[in-house]
Amino acid sequence: MFDSNHEQELSKRRTFAIISHPDAGKTTITEKMLFFGKVIRVPGTIKGRGSGKYAKSDWMNIEKERGISITTSVMQFTYKNILMNLLDTPGHQDFSEDTYRILTAVDCCLVVIDAAKGIEERTRKLMDVARIHNTPIITFINKLDRDSRDPIEILDEIEKELKLHCIPISWPISCGKNFRGVYHIYDKIIHLYKSKFRKNFLTLDSFLDGSLNEYLGADLSIHIRQELELIMNVYSKFNKEKFLKGITTPIFFGSALGNFGIDHLLDSLIKWAPSPLYRQSNKRIIKPQERKFTGFIFKIQANMDLKHRDRIAFMRIVSGQYTKGMKLTHVRIKKNIIISDAFSFLAGERISINKAYPGDVIGLHNHGTIKIGDTFTQGEEIKFIGIPSFAPEIFRLIYLKNPLKQKQLKKGLVQLSEEGTVQVFRPILNNDLILGAIGILQFDVVIERLRIEYNIDAVYKKVNIVLARWINYGNHHSLYNLKKSYSSYLAYDISNSLIYLAPSSANLNIVMSQNSDISFNATREQ
């Protein structure tokens, strides 16, 4: 049954991801948001091995041991009567392509930047993916209570490297040990950081009439007035339409560890982030207001519960609404199934649900039939597009210490591959198993999970591969010629798509020039 309050449910939902480079403070921000959403009572920080205290969003065993985020957690909380669907992506330098795919399931991104370091490598790569969909970006410049770069310098870097026009919403009053707070340009309020006075904020009147000297001192008061005058003359005013098109980014400053500025971010998500957006299918645009249910799978996690050895498929609802016990069509395999046990998430915890709406992320039990990119509908034969696989950047040959466990190894690798941890390739000329990943840590994750979850001891050998490109060919004669000349470089991935594994960029360029009627692609649609 379709709710009459469907539009209202849409208007009070925000689905967003937090992305950053390692150690920019993303997990601390996540926890503080959960604190504001009253999901956790006391915000904590990630602790090292043996401390026994870990971030709420870091629930996998290896994450707890190493004190880093290497998977993607989905969390739902309410803030000021708005339902927030937060997808917490790994912040560690070496994460999987699963992180990239998460960005296809959100309507907005919060980018966290370390004020001392500015734009870093992983932030650039994640922004390249976000830009494919023109995802709206809100930027938080963190750690102002530590030694920092000049704020204007950071904004210049954002505009140059991320190709976003910066719109400062708040502005810092000094930094490091002298950090006194921020001036909210649009609310015209000065928020004081760890004020020695009873007031936590000052109105614009006190900013103008000189009484600010009492709180900041005469020299700093004069400096911040001059700086703000410059900022408000140089940078444009906030325009929501340009923000929603991914042209501009509102800028906030603060300290997540000091619990300062997080409420400003949440308020901006409520005011400016879009409610659930439409998605493109292979046949038409699907709007969230439509009555019929549609959704797509963007992530699979194997063995979230070791006691049950289960596999969970994460589905983003696009249109209609989920109701417990409803019948859905699994389009790829053309099979109707009844969904009676979907649930929502709080990190590793599951909460059974009776209803869910567009923008929500729900979990489905998966017995091996659901794959990343699968579409579910109420009968319509469509497929959502824009959920790609990305070519790995690092490669290893994996083999067993005990060759008798080859069957278990293949099963474990299939599951880990289907959830996006690594990609598995089978050379067409031999029985080797080659793994490909975005970051080196993923290989450690695979070895650890094979040992803990499948009781398999495996090791790696280096392999002479530096690039991978999926092959699309127009006719079988072209493919025959390629296989005839370069069969030793060809392999199949887990979906039996042909891929070229190049030992060097020069080799790839030569092969491409000799086979101009074949396309070599860095991404593959699921």
UniProtKB/Swiss-Prot annotation:
Full protein name: Peptide chain release factor 3
Highest taxon, organism lineage: Bacteria
Pfam families in the record: EF-G_D2 (PF22042), GTP_EFTU (PF00009), RF3_C (PF16658)
Gene from which the chain derives: prfC
Main location: cytoplasm
GO MF terms, alphabetically ordered: GTP binding; GTPase activity; guanosine tetraphosphate binding; translation release factor activity, codon nonspecific; translation release factor activity, codon specific
InterPro entries, per database record: EF-G-like_DII (IPR053905), EFG_III/V (IPR035647), G_TR_CS (IPR031157), P-loop_NTPase (IPR027417), PrfC (IPR004548), RF3_C (IPR032090), RF3_dom_3_sf (IPR038467), RF3_GTP-bd (IPR041732)
tr-type G domain: residues covered: 11-277
Organism of this sequence: Buchnera aphidicola subsp. Acyrthosiphon pisum (strain APS) (Acyrthosiphon pisum symbiotic bacterium)
This protein's GO CC annotations: cytosol
Gene Ontology biological process terms, A to Z: regulation of translational termination
Keyword presence, Cytoplasm: yes
Functional note: Increases the formation of ribosomal termination complexes and stimulates activities of RF-1 and RF-2. It binds guanine nucleotides and has strong preference for UGA stop codons. It may interact directly with the ribosome. The stimulation of RF-1 and RF-2 is significantly reduced by GTP and GDP, but not by GMP.
Record key words, sorted: Cytoplasm, GTP-binding, Nucleotide-binding, Protein biosynthesis
Sequence positions that bind GTP: 20-27, 88-92, 142-145
Similarity remark: Belongs to the TRAFAC class translation factor GTPase superfamily. Classic translation factor GTPase family. PrfC subfamily.
Localisation: Cytoplasm
